[in-house]
Amino acid sequence: MTDQAPVTYAGPPRVLSGVQPSGALHLGNYLGALVKFTRLQHEIDTFIFVADLHAITVWQDPAALAQQTREIAAAYIASGLDPDKATIFPQSAVREHAELSWIFNCVARLGWLDRMTQFKEKSGKHKERSSVGLYTYPVLQAADILIYKATHVPVGEDQKQHLELTRDIAQKFNHDFNAPGFFPLPDPLIQGPGARVMSLRDGSAKMSKSDPSDYSRINLTDTADDIAAKVKKARTDPEPLPETIEELATRAEADNLVGIFAALAGKTKAEVLADYAGKGFGTFKPALAELAVESLAPVGERMRGLLGDPAVLDAILAKGAEKAREAAAPTLAEVKKLVGFWGA
């Protein structure tokens, strides 16, 4: 669908994002999401959720899911999110997400979902054995965003297509139910440096919690010694660092480590090269390790402290869920009226 703009959304700006509780968070999550969430809370009304409904599109251990939800919440707070500024909550605690998702399933077209490349990547050769939830995942994502009438969504490369689908669903709903401007057409917040952190063992693969090698990633719960050891053992090449970004781009592992340094230091890659061009990794790695420990070790310490008192975390999540429901309920009530449901 193409955007039509005779009537635009007139509500207040709001940002929404979430992370699945499907494993330990790592440096890629920290630089690609958590740091940006922390910054956004000071600039715009911010809703950050734990995406547990999305997590169960693939099997999750029921005995571990609640604790994994706490771990994501602990990571949010340890990274600098303030529960008094940002609304932090578990997705499953706000039933309006699921209700709006069903309505959107009836608005979205099958052809739109057939074009979603992420389902093809995640289902692989076993599409017939994948859950229906994995296929309709982008529709729930649209409901996550639009139940709060979020106007901005931080996205990486792998989520841009889903945000376009959200815009299509919003536009079609507004048109079908004669409600111009009811839902916003959310804009992407394109993520800058640090948005794509690669494996420490393979510069061509994204850093991932599913990689069998723990040395491929820096976990947020790693100790200072763990962090330093992983940086020291990170894969590199024998050449000194180059002078230009163009040369750096041809060396995947070097490019990744320089990118990590730049993101942690709040610099550009060019600025890092200005300091380290011509120097070998015997000089660069210790500097990167020191910076990574300085940046990440306190986050791990705060996380461990928060997880040591689950009652406090649960209270934060319950309060956030209540606040989220207060924002979501009026939207769903209006949607039901527009659709024409009995009693609405």
Curated annotation (Swiss-Prot):
GO cellular component: cytosol
A GO MF label: tryptophan-tRNA ligase activity
Subunit-structure text: Homodimer.
EC number: 6.1.1.2
The UniProt record lists the keyword ATP-binding: yes
Motif residue range(s): 'KMSKS' region: 206-210
Keywords, in A-Z order: Aminoacyl-tRNA synthetase, ATP-binding, Cytoplasm, Ligase, Nucleotide-binding, Protein biosynthesis
Pfam families: tRNA-synt_1b (PF00579)
Primary location: cytoplasm
Subcellular location: Cytoplasm
Chain positions recorded as ATP binding sites: 20-22, 28-29, 156-158, 197, 206-210
Gene (UniProt): trpS
GO biological process, one term: tryptophanyl-tRNA aminoacylation
Species this protein is from: Caulobacter vibrioides (strain ATCC 19089 / CIP 103742 / CB 15)
Enzyme class: ligase
PROSITE patterns attached to this UniProt entry: AA_TRNA_LIGASE_I
UniProt name for this protein: Tryptophan--tRNA ligase
Locus of motif 'HIGH' region: 21-29
Residues noted as binding L-tryptophan in the record, renumbered to the chain: 144
InterPro entries: aa-tRNA-synth_I_CS, aa-tRNA-synth_Ic, Rossmann-like_a/b/a_fold, Trp-tRNA-ligase, Trp-tRNA-ligase_bac-type, Trp-tRNA_synthetase
